[in-house]
Amino acid sequence: MGEPVLTRVHSLRERMDSTLANHRNEILMFLSRIESHGKGILKPHQLLAEYEAISKEDKLKLDDGHGAFAEVIKSTQEAIVSPPWVALAIRLRPGVWEYVRVNVHHLVVEELSVPQYLQFKEELVIGSSDANFVLELDFAPFTASFPRPTLTKSIGNGVEFLNRHLSAKMFHGKDSMHPLLEFLRLHNYNGKTLMLNNRVQNVNGLQSMLRKAGDYLSTLPSDTPYSEFEHKFQEIGFERGWGDTAERVTEMFHMLLDLLEAPDASTLETFLGKIPMVFNVVILSPHGYFAQENVLGYPDTGGQVVYILDQVPALEREMIKRIKEQGLDIKPRILIVTRLLPDAVGTTCNQRLEKVFGAEHAHILRVPFRTEKGILRKWISRFEVWPYIETFTEDVAKEIALELQAKPDLIIGNYSEGNLVASLLAHKLGVTQCTIAHALEKTKYPDSDIYWEKFDKKYHFSSQFTADLIAMNHTDFIITSTFQEIAGSKDTVGQYESHTAFTMPGLYRVVHGIDVFDPKFNIVSPGADTSVYFSYKEKEKRLTTLHPEIEELLYSSVENEEHLCIIKDKNKPILFTMARLDNVKNLTGFVEWYAKSPKLRELVNLVVVGGDRRKESKDLEEQAQMKKMYELIDTYKLNGQFRWISSQMNRVRNGELYRYIADTKGAFVQPAFYEAFGLTVVEAMTCGLPTFATLHGGPAEIIVHGKSGFHIDPYHGEQVAELLVNFFEKCKTDPSQWDAISAGGLKRIQEKYTWQIYSERLLTLAGVYGFWKHVSKLDRLEIRRYLEMFYALKYRKLAESVPLAKDE
C-alpha cells in the first residue's frame, strides 16, 4: 500500500480557471444570467436562485462531481455586475475572504485585492475613479506584531488565546517577568498602595519574600484574618489585596510562585482575575429614555436598557464579593451615564441622579446634551445625536470626577454613540475600555455603506459608521452576546465581520477595518433578571394578584388606546410576541403570516405587544408600521382572534404575562429580520414559554432547534406559519410535546445564560486586558494616534454636518 501523498491546495482562482477551461458553455450561460441583471449588486439569495434555475445536467458538469462551483456560488456574499465584468466577494469561512472578477465575454478570471474590489464596487455609484485619490483606512499594520489566532473556533475566545500568548512570553527568563512585577507594584486605591510596596525591587526578591511569607502562613489557622499579620507582611513588601484570610492569601501566593516558576494560561487568568483592579465602573448609554420605570416601548428604549439594568446589580454583587475576598474595605461604585431629558414625558429622565433598584452603590447619572445656545430639552433619535457627543463627553468627564472623586477603573460603552463617548473618555483618562455594540446598524440596513448618501439625510450613517470604526479599534476588549455578532455563521456575515472591508464612495474606503480573529473579542452572554423572570411552574413565586390586570389586558371586550381588537375564544393557546414596532423587528410581517394561515388562526389566538397607540409617535418607522398594522387588521378581518396591545413598561407584570401565556400552553415568537442577541427570547425561555425565534442573529445560538425551541426564517413566512401549525397540532394530540420544549428551554438558560456567569467573566476580562494594556502600551499608542487623526479630520466634520435639533 502506497504512502499517503500531501497535495497542494489549489487557490480559488486556479479552481475557477480549471472549471472555465472544462465547461466554457455552461459557465458562459450561468454568468450571462448574472450579467443580464444589469449594473448593480446581487445578494446571495439572488445568486442561488440563478444557480438553481440551470438544468441538473449543467450543474453536474459545473461541479465536476465535487460540488466545487456550487460551493463558490454558495460562498459568494455579493456579486458586483458591471458588464462585461462580474466581481465576486467570496467568503471561504468566517473572517476569510477572497475577491475575483470574471470577464463574461472572454471568460477571463482575475484575482482582486481588497482595494481593487472596493474600487470596482464604487464605480456603481460614482463611475470610474482612477484619477481620484481616495482615503483608505487600514488598521492591519498596527496589529501586525500582535498575536492573533487563525482557527474559527478561536473567534470570540480572545482572552483564552491572550492568556496562552502572555504565559508563553513569560517563559523567557526573569526579565520577562518584570512587567508582572511592575503591574503589581502599580496598584493603589485613592493613593493607598495595594499588593506590593517598594520594598520588593526585583523578581528574585519577590520570589524570596513569597516563600518566606508562605512558610509563615502555613503556621496559621486557615481562617486567620489578614489584619492579624498585616503589619508583619508590610515590612517585607506586601500590602493589602492578596486576600481576607490566611487561606486566600496562601492560594494567591502559590499561584504567583507557580507563574514565576512555569507560567501557564489557566493560572495566569485565575490570578489576574483575583487582583483588585475594578472599584469604580462607568457605563455609557446616552440615547433613548434611560430610566427604571415607564420607559420600555418608548422610541430607542428597549433591550439595551433592560440589559444594563439587569447587568448592574449582578456586576455590583460580584464586585462586592471579590473586594471582600481580597481583604479590602472598599465600597464599589457603578455609574450608568445617560442623557438628561428636561422634557421627561412622565419619566425620571429629568433627574440628575437616580439610585439603581437592587443595588447599593450604583446610580444613573444623567448629563444633558447642550450647545452654545443652551440645553436640548426634548428626546431625539439615536441617529441624530452626533453633533452633541463631543461636548457631552467633556461634561461627562467633569460629572464622573465629581461623583467618584477618582478615575474610573473600567469604562463600558453601549451602542455606537456610547462606545464613542467611552473611547474619548478612556483615551483622556488612560482607563481600560470595554465595548458592547448591541447592534451595528450597517448589517441591519443592506447596502447602507455603498449607497450611504441615500441614507444619510435620515440616518446619518456616515457619522455612525465612522464612530463604530473608531470605537472598535480603540477599545481594549469587546464583549458580544453571540458568535454570530462577531463572525456570523457558515452562510451569513457577522456584524463585526461586515466592517472588515467596505466603502462609502466619495467619503473613504475601509481596506481593513476590524479583524474577527482579533483576541479583543469575547463572547459573554447575558441572562434575564431571575427575580422577574422565572418558570411558570414555580407556583409559590407566581404573582397571581396581577392576573386580573393581565386578563383585562388580553381578553377584555373594551377597545381603546391600550388594546385594539378582541379575542373571542379564550380557550385557545396564545401566540405571543413583544418588541419595538420598527422595520427590523418585523411585527407586522409576523401578523401577516398569521393572517394568511387559516389553520394557524383556527388553532391559536395572536397577541402582539408593540408600539404606543396612547400617544402620537415621532418615530417615522413606527408611524409606518402602525399604518401597516391597521391595514392588516382590516384586510384580513383579524378582530376576534387578535389583540394588539400598546407597549408595556412594567417589567414585573411582563414577567407574569409570559408565565400566564405559558399557562394557556401558548408560545413566544421573535420574528425579527435580524436580532443581535435576543433578550426577549431569553426572558420567554426563562419563564418556560416555548420559543420560535429568527435564525438571523443571536437567537440561532440561544436555541437548539427542536430541543429548546425552534429557529424560523423571517424571509419565508409561509414556512414559519406551517412550523407553528405543526407544533400546535402535535401539542393538541400529545401535550408532552409542549412540556418537552418548555423544559428544554429552561435547561438551556440555566446552563448558559445567567447574569452571575456574565459578571464573573466580565471582571476577569477586565483584569486580563488591564494587564495586556500595561505590557503593550507603546504599541497601542501608535493606533490611538492614527485614530486621533481620523477622528479630528473625518468624524468631526461628519458630525457637524448633522442638523441640530430644535426644541418645539
Curated annotation (Swiss-Prot):
Region (GT-B glycosyltransferase): 277-754
EC number(s) reported in the record: 2.4.1.13
GO BP: sucrose metabolic process
Keywords annotated in UniProt: Glycosyltransferase, Transferase
Enzyme class name: transferase
Pfam families, sorted: Glycos_transf_1, GT-B_Sucrose_synth, SUS_EPBD, SUS_N
InterPro entries (UniProt xref): Glyco_trans_1, Sucrose_synth_GT-B1, Sucrose_synthase_pln/cyn, SUS_EPBD, SUS_N
Gene Ontology molecular functions: sucrose synthase activity
Tissue distribution of the protein: Expressed in stems, in roots at different developmental stages, and in flower buds, flowers and maturing seeds, with the highest levels in strong utilization sinks for sucrose such as growing stems and tap root tips.
Subunit record text: Homotetramer.
Domain of life, source organism: Eukaryota
Function, in words: Sucrose-cleaving enzyme that provides UDP-glucose and fructose for various metabolic pathways.
Known catalytic reactions: an NDP-alpha-D-glucose + D-fructose = a ribonucleoside 5'-diphosphate + sucrose + H(+)
Record PANTHER family: PTHR45839, SUCROSE SYNTHASE 1
Sequence similarity: Belongs to the glycosyltransferase 1 family. Plant sucrose synthase subfamily.
Name by which UniProt lists this protein: Sucrose synthase isoform 1
